[in-house]
């Protein structure tokens, strides 16, 4: 009797596909989770074996034989298969697309599938050791609560103000996991947060294999790091939302930093919440998970404060800053109806910037709008630069001389005249980071103004170069979007100005108020 294998393929269909095992192949239950090369239509595709059913819905005569089972890597573990199956069912995504989309590109391509073994090599840290800092009472209490919970699934919400030492708590928990012979997974929302955190983790654990996984890596580096995690060589995995799917055979701890951040949600392709998948993964593996944030999401806060017998998370609080004597910043609200802003800057803010320049200190102006102006319009007929593909406005990027949609990527050159009435006196309404940068250069010609947004730091290398300039004192005024406003520690920074923060409340987002609060607190 011919043996049947059930295979998941990267196709937009909510089903698996049955194949026959050819005469020279031998497939057992131990091969469930292995990659397999199969014919599909006129193509050859890479799939994943998910089952060995005794029979198929189709007669054997209609089933095609597999080409080969790939043994170049260990099989994907059972918990990984259950995780991707849950994601498929919960988020209504084709199962094959969920599974295959999480693999490095080379491992799902028939042309390069057999090169996987050659790329696999251990990823280790060459950083030096580091003395452990003393813990405050609140940090010790948080660690004690987590350790006293004992083995099994436990979920914790670590609510700590900015600078309260949450990262040190993470490192102590990772140390405990490593001592127990387990792997640790640390998720962060943004690529630009990984270099600083990766350096800190590497310095703490110099002899432990650490890898990072995010979209900023090249395909070869991502495949190498992914394979190190799968084989168990990597003991600590640091990554963004896609790393939630990383196969880890000895996973013992999951940490989600900045759990409230919307970047943990995949908004296109296979949609999912990496934070929620991390909680599911911890539950099915019966391991602890820690969600950390200075501004927890409303649903996480509700899960932690619902009351005895109803709370899903245990709330742990860090109310004081880790540095002795450090205080929360003084917040001053400027009513621009009274202190009218010129070019977006009130008189009080301009005076504060001038004072910091005299003292040789850094300032940061936060404006969560890229480009030069958010919209271009015609005062004669009322035309505005709308995107023909979606409902968003086309943003003016003056240096590139183009109008670009920040939602779908559509771009066109800047029009010399209104396409509706022919008026050549078009007006750029509002301001973005490029316009604010130009304004600051005019007001403070002696200042070194540095803009940090997705346009100036689109790659990790660009971000690291900008961060080195900031840390090296080569910038006096920083202009940035949300990628600069969270998770960073700049020693010379003593002033933060937020430009028109209430504009965020008018976004077409029911979480607008929640996200504005989180940004301001960060």
Give the role of each language-model region.
Residues 1-295, 299-301, 305-326, 357-358, ...:
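Accessory, non-ATPase domains that flank or precede helicase/AAA+ motor cores in DNA-metabolism machines
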Residues 257-276, 471-476, 481-522:
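Conserved RecA-like helicase motor core of SF1/SF2 enzymes
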Residues 185, 205-217, 316, 388-389, ...:
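Conserved RecA-like helicase motor-core motifs
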Residues 211-219, 261-272, 337-343, 425-429, ...:
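Flexible beta-alpha connector loops of hexameric P-loop NTPases
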Residues 12-14, 215, 219, 231-234, ...:
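Cys/His-rich Zn2+-binding cysteine-cluster or related metal-binding knuckle/ribbon modules and their
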Residues 218-230, 448-480:
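Conserved helicase ATPase core of P-loop NTP-dependent helicases/translocases
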Residues 194-205, 376-389, 433-448:
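Conserved helicase motor "Helicase C" RecA-like lobe of SF1/SF2 P-loop NTPases
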Residues 239-251, 373, 440, 460, ...:
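SF2 helicase motor core recognition
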């Amino acid at each position: 009797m011919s043996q049947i294998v059930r295979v998941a393929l990267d196709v937009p269909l909510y089903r698996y596909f049955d194949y026959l095992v050819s005469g020279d192949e031998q497939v057992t239950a131990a091969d469930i989770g292995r990659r397999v090369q199969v014919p599909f239509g006129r193509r050859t595709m890479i799939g994943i074996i998910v089952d060995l059913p005794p029979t198929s819905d189709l007669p054997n005569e209609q089933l095609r034989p597999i080409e080969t089972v790939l043994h170049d890597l260990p099989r994907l573990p059972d918990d990984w298969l259950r995780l991707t199956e849950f994601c498929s069912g919960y988020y209504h995504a084709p199962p094959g697309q969920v599974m295959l989309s999480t693999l490095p590109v080379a491992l799902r391509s028939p042309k390069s599938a057999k090169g996987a073994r050659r790329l696999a090599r251990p990823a280790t840290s060459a950083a030096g050791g580091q003395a452990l800092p003393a813990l405050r009472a609140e940090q010790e209490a948080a660690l004690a609560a987590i350790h006293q919970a004992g083995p099994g699934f436990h979920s914790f919400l670590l609510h700590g103000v900015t600078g309260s030492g949450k990262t040190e708590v993470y490192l102590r928990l990772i140390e405990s996991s490593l001592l127990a012979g387990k792997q640790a997974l640390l998720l962060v929302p943004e690529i630009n947060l990984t270099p600083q955190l990766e350096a800190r983790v590497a310095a703490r654990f110099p002899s432990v294999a650490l890898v990072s996984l995010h979209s900023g890596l090249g395909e070869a580096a991502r495949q190498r790091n992914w394979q190190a995690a799968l084989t168990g060589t990597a003991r600590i995995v640091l990554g963004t939302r896609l790393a939630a799917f990383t196969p880890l055979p000895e996973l013992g701890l999951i940490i989600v930093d900045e759990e409230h951040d919307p970047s943990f949600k995949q908004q296109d392709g296979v949609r999912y919440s990496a934070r929620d998948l991390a909680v599911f993964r911890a539950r099915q593996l019966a391991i602890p998970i820690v969600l950390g944030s200075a501004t927890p999401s409303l649903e996480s806060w509700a899960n932690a404060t619902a009351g005895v017998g109803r709370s899903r998370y245990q709330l742990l609080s860090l109310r004081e800053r880790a540095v002795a004597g450090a205080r929360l910043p003084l917040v001053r609200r400027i009513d621009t109806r009274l202190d009218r802003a010129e070019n977006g800057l009130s008189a009080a803010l301009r005076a504060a910037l001038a004072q910091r320049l005299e003292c040789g200190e850094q300032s940061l102006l936060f404006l969560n709008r890229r480009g030069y102006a958010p919209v271009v319009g015609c005062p004669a007929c009322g035309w505005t630069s709308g995107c023909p593909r979606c409902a968003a406005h086309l943003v003016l990027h003056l240096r590139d001389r183009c109008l670009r949609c920040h939602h779908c990527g559509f771009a066109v050159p800047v029009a010399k005249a209104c396409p509706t009435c022919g008026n050549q006196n078009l007006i750029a309404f509002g301001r973005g980071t490029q316009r604010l940068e130009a304004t600051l250069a005019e007001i403070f010609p002696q200042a070194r103004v540095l803009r940090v947004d997705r346009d100036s730091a689109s790659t990790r290398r660009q971000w690291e170069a900008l961060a080195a300039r900031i840390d090296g004192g080569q910038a006096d005024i920083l202009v940035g979007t949300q990628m600069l406003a969270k998770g960073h520690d700049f020693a010379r920074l003593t002033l933060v100005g937020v430009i028109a923060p209430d504009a965020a409340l008018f976004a077409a987002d029911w979480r607008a108020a929640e996200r504005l609060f989180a940004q301001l607190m960060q």
